[in-house]
Amino acid sequence: EATGVHTKFYRFPGGSSTQNTSLSIQNFIDVLKKNHYLYLDWNVISPDINNANATKEQVVTGVMQGVDAYDTAVVLMYDVADKPMTVKALPSIIKQIKAKNYELLPVDESMILIQHNNGNQEEGK
């Protein structure tokens, strides 16, 4: 309401396969479905998420290896102060994606939803 934009998508903190809750994730998924929300996860993780010392080159290489492995890749990246390499790596990642004639698409209802909880990691190439 505050932004005037209505979203239809939800990303679970930690993903739909998270073990960080004592409640069943399926209960949350059922509520989302009942309210016509779609949830999505990721199948590629930027290396700097788990390694604060990752270099720009490591981030680019790690992300591109993941992107190359899937027909549909959803990349988890954080734009936060303690992950500065994400922002620094993005121009190189985008350039490489375009050079390979891959598409950069927004999240929308037509995409293949990557969902950890139902086992959909999307088939590799």
Positions of predicted regions on the chain:
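Catalytic domains of cell-wall/extracellular-matrix polysaccharide-remodeling enzymes
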Residues: E1-K98, Y102-E103, D108-I112, H116-N120
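N-terminal secretory targeting signals
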Residues: E122-K125
